[in-house]
Amino acid sequence: MGKLLLAVVCLFSVSAFASEKAFDLKMDLSIEGKHVSSPRIVVKEGEKGTITQESNGEKSFIEVVAKEDKAPNGKQAIHMAFVVGKIANDGTRTVVSQPQIISIPNEKAQITVGENGKPEVLSLSVIANKTTL
């Protein structure tokens, strides 16, 4: 009986100290050549995080799902799938871009979306780090 009780106590103490993988993302976002924001968010691995913001009367949003991955060179990396868009006054969301970035932890990664000869539609940079919750 004493061994069973000890096993149960150990099981609960291990789960009490278990932590969830998460990612701390520091971003810079520009839409149509205008700096929109520099948000920071911590997201659980595989779960969607959402940021909405308003600047100069214009609303925008960023959604992101992050997970551990490997870079092409085999190093540990963080894969981030974004949805970036604008929010109209009536609340309607318009997606501007859905970029994906694979980043080495604590190194800046950037993606710019646009067409040749035209102003950029979107520029998103991110510094991602692993953390726990």
Which stretches of residues belong to each language-model region?
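Sec-dependent N-terminal signal peptides
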Residues: 4-14
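Outer membrane pore-forming secretion/assembly proteins and partners of Gram-negative envelopes
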Residues: 18-133
